A protein has these predicted regions:
Chain B
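Glycine-rich phosphate-binding loops of nucleotide-dependent enzymes
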Residues: 2-238
Length: 300, 238, 337
């Protein structure tokens, strides 16, 4: 029975799942960065990523190579994230959490509307970052595109990790997220750390968008909405305050959703997301803080 | 007379509609260690917050001759005032070493910072052993030491200490105040310490102010206050 | 005349104004706009319920649109399959949604904050798919069309409705029905908030640990809060179905859950009067946005910008503003000089 099972297909589906999961992971990490620093889920993260993708498209349209556009878009997205935080989040820095959540919801519409207005609703496409040829690894055919996506996603996340772990600014940023009052007292401009967080999150979102778009024949302003849902789910699965959790959660989710879609018949494309969400709910009921989240300690 | 390092004149402070300080005046001279005493709610913590800029305040507040009455907390730290807040402000998610490194955030002299890390840890050998431990797992006394060490990494000219004895066993408290005294005497670090435990505080400082309901009720040298029975009984509780 | 009498007189005056406004508002607007007013009333009911859950008990829900769906589909199914008259389905719509709300509240016992939001969000996202799946009951992707399949059950299909001898247009009837239920719902919510249950809600919101130490049963409180807010959402959903005379999976998407949350926060968490403003805000903002321009993307941009600006100017919602304004007035009334 074991020999009759198609291991090749399993391996291939796992890699495909990891590729989707990788894209979700970069957006999920963006969500976690903002959650840790600002305390809210940025509902506009997907739309910001979409906007970045359109900027990339415009650059390519004006003659830039894919990778040239990629890095320039990262820089522009970073600046955009900082600007958004200063303009829209800073005024509600001291407001209740739900107020800030509603602001991000408003931002969702603002960014989406702006993207629709600047770039007309016709569909577009972004060239593929990697060649679409298959590559042979241990006798199994994988798509270079998938492997490349996984590499870039994980690479981006790793760079972010290095920043937070090993640089002075990264340390200050982490401290500001943990205890802004005490961090202020050592001379850190906590407010700007927030802006930095938003800039980095926007850049990560841009990576996510620019990896998503080429895989589709064409894309429009609705590009990132499903990605946001999956990224949110992956982050929650892994533990919303843990960047590592967000990555692992998203990768797992990617593989799970893909395997479910491949092997379980009644899970058509309709039910992929609800079933994934049901699984996550199941996990949460056993581990309420997610797989890697730290259980909330109650100070009595 | 030399200019005081820190000077407060007729300072008021409030939390929203509630006024906590009703015009207090105090000073700390270069290299001096001064205590601020008083009962709960007297305004001791608020006084430190007024200096570091973490509460709404008005009045004259000068550090090294320059006014800091309108300065934001980040800039006050940069000016050379290290505030160890009430509750220690430990960055629990970071390691001990990271907490220390953060203390030196405003400094640019990397070699000196490394040297300072060694020097500071020599005062707190317990911390040296726990370099890569998560700060949240330290005991109360160790966290207090870490907070103090982190403040020292700033190379401050003035140290603001808020209720260092809170929640700690007497032996630990004695140890901390011994270190504070050593820092003051050996390195000439000016200290303004707020304490409910008057006994320990008066032992470790040269002068003291006693606050009552947001005003300075008594001031004098620590030695005098220790000897004054009337003051001790009415204001210091012993 | 003492201060107390003055206070009571003020209350009577406020109630009188409200009742007069309720009775005469449709005269001031066209028949067509009565429909919008009715829809505002429907939102009002839903967000009063959501406020009880989120504003007073501190539990986040991103799934109240799905609870409205439960109510709306209950109404539609009863009309189409069981031939109930539309208005009589409303209580059952509320009840069914209340039960589902209770069930949703169960994860709340284990999850908190963001994770609870996730659970309710999962429910909201899954709802359209679930509705499509159980097509026998729900009519699948087509939904249920009361106009075609249950016309006799629709009140006022002929265009006029006669109640107690008065006759009025169908739109006016819907307005009076929606806001009538809304006022009753508001009164009930107000009584709940002022009662011991209300204090229990607030205790859970402010500190679960403290509440538990005071002997409050967290499980009961949370699930009750979910259930009762579910009832409100279900009633609102049933009214929406009655008004539209059709339900399908697209009527109750995740967007509706968001709109309800926006309405609640803009109105003011923990403030019931603010919910009136919140309801009108979410009802009329889309229209206003389209009025500015119909160029692609601009209505959305305006919609989002309006939300952001309101939140920046009024971080605690309209209710927060009302409280700040009313405090010196009421303090003066009730305190000695």
């Amino acid at each position: 029975m074991l020999l009759a099972f198609d291991w090749t297909q399993l391996a291939q589906q796992i890699v495909i799942g990891l590729a989707s999961g990788g894209v979700w992971a970069t957006l999920a990490v963006a969500l976690v960065v903002i959650y840790r620093s600002t305390g809210v889920i940025n509902f506009a993260q997907g739309e910001m990523a979409m906007f970045s993708t359109f900027i990339a498209w415009s650059l390519v349209h004006h003659g830039f190579s894919y990778w040239g556009a990629f890095f320039l878009t990262l820089a522009i997205s970073f600046a955009g994230g900082v600007a958004i935080e200063r303009a829209v989040i800073r005024p509600v820095e001291r407001a209740p959490v739900l107020t800030v959540v509603i602001v991000t919801l408003g931002l969702f519409f603002v960014v989406n509307g702006a993207a629709r207005w600047i770039w007309s609703p016709e569909t577009r496409s972004l060239p593929n970052a990697f060649s679409t040829r298959p590559i042979d690894v241990a006798g199994v055919a994988f798509s270079i595109s998938d492997l490349g996506t996984i590499a870039v996603s994980l690479g981006a996340v790793a760079l972010l990790w290095v920043f937070f772990r090993f640089t002075k600014l990264g340390l200050a940023s982490r401290a500001a997220a943990v205890n802004p009052e005490a961090t202020r007292l050592v001379g850190v401009r906590v407010s700007w750390m927030l802006a930095l967080g938003w800039g980095l999150a926007a850049a990560m979102g841009a990576v996510s968008g620019m990896l998503t778009a080429p895989a589709l024949a064409s894309f429009d302003q609705n590009l990132m909405q499903p990605i946001l849902l999956y990224a949110f789910a992956g982050a929650v699965l892994g533990g919303i305050d843990s960047p590592l959790g967000a990555v692992i959660g998203s990768l797992l989710l990617g593989v799970l959703v893909n395997l479910l879609g491949t092997y379980v018949d009644w899970v058509g494309s309709e039910l992929r997301l609800p079933v994934a969400l049901a699984v996550i709910l199941g996990v949460l009921l056993i581990r309420p803080a997610g797989l890697f989240g730290r259980p909330v300690e109650q100070r009595v | 007379m030399a200019e005081p390092l820190l000077e407060l004149e007729d300072v008021t402070a409030r939390y929203g509609p509630v006024t906590a300080l009703h015009g207090i005046s105090l000073r700390v001279d270069q290299g001096e260690s001064v205590a601020v005493l008083g009962a709960n709610g007297a305004g001791k913590t608020t006084t430190l917050r007024a200096v570091s800029g973490t509460v709404r305040r008005s009045g004259k507040i000068a550090f090294g001759g320059k006014s800091i009455a309108r300065t934001a907390p980040e800039a006050v730290a940069r000016a050379g005032i290290a505030h160890v807040p009430e509750g220690r402000g430990t960055l629990t998610e970071l390691t001990v070493r990271e907490n220390l490194r953060l203390g030196a955030y405003t400094r640019r002299d990397r070699k000196a910072v490394a040297g300072d890390e060694r020097r500071v840890l020599s005062y707190f050998p317990q911390l040296a052993q726990r370099g890569s431990q998560r700060a949240g797992t330290l005991s109360g006394g160790e966290q207090q030491m870490l907070a103090l060490a982190r403040a020292l990494m700033l190379r401050p000219r003035l140290l603001l200490l808020d209720e260092p004895s809170l929640g700690l066993a007497p032996l630990v408290v004695a140890e901390i105040f011994r270190i504070v005294r050593e820092l003051n005497e050996r390195e000439g670090l000016a200290v303004l310490v707020v304490e409910q435990n008057a006994v320990v505080a008066l032992d470790a400082t040269a002068r003291a102010y006693v606050l009552e309901v947001g005003k300075v009720a008594v001031e004098g040298t620590s030695a005098d206050l220790q000897r004054d029975e009337a003051v001790r009984r009415s204001y210091l509780g012993y | 005349m003492g201060r107390r009498a003055l206070g009571i007189a003020l209350w009577v005056a406020v109630v009188a104004v409200i009742l007069v406004a309720y009775a005469f508002a449709p005269r001031l607007v066209s028949d067509f706009h009565s429909r919008d007013l009715a829809e505002a009333g429907i939102f009002f009911i839903a967000i009063v319920g959501l406020n009880l859950l989120t504003g007073y008990t501190g539990q986040i829900s991103l799934g109240h649109g799905a609870l409205m769906a439960v109510g709306g589909y209950t109404t539609a199914a009863l009309m189409v399959h069981e031939h109930w008259r539309d208005v009589w389905t409303i209580p059952l719509a509320g009840l069914t949604a209340g039960v589902v709300g209770f069930l949703i509240g169960l994860p709340a016992l284990r999850l908190s904050g963001l994770y609870l939001a996730m659970a309710t969000f999962a429910f909201a996202v899954a709802m359209p798919s679930l509705l499509r799946k159980f097509s026998g009951l729900t009519g699948g992707g087509q939904g249920l069309r009361m106009l075609e399949d249950a016309p006799l059950q629709i009140t006022g299909l002929s265009g006029t409705v006669t109640i107690f001898g008065h006759s009025m247009t169908q739109n006016h009837f819907l307005y009076y029905l929606a806001w009538g239920i809304g006022l009753v719902g508001f009164l009930i919510a107000w009584l709940i908030v002022r009662s011991r249950v209300g204090r229990t809600f607030r205790a859970v919101r402010d500190s679960e640990v403290a509440a538990t130490s005071a002997g409050i049963n967290l499980a009961w409180t949370k699930t009750f809060a979910f259930a009762i807010s579910g009832v409100y959402a279900g009633v609102a959903g049933g009214l929406l179905a009655t008004q539209n005379q059709i339900v399908n999976p697209l009527t109750f998407t995740f967007l509706l859950s968001i709109v309800l949350l926006v309405g609640t926060v803009v109105g003011g968490l923990g403030s019931l009067p603010g919910m009136v403003v919140g309801a009108f805000f979410v009802e009329y903002l889309p229209d206003v946005s389209t009025h500015v321009s119909t160029a692609p993307g601009v209505p959305d941009f305006v919609y989002g910008a309006a939300i952001i600006v309101v939140m920046i100017l009024l971080p605690t919602g309209v209710g927060g503003l009302l409280k700040r304004v009313a405090r010196p007035l009421t303090t003066r009334l009730y305190l000695r000089p």
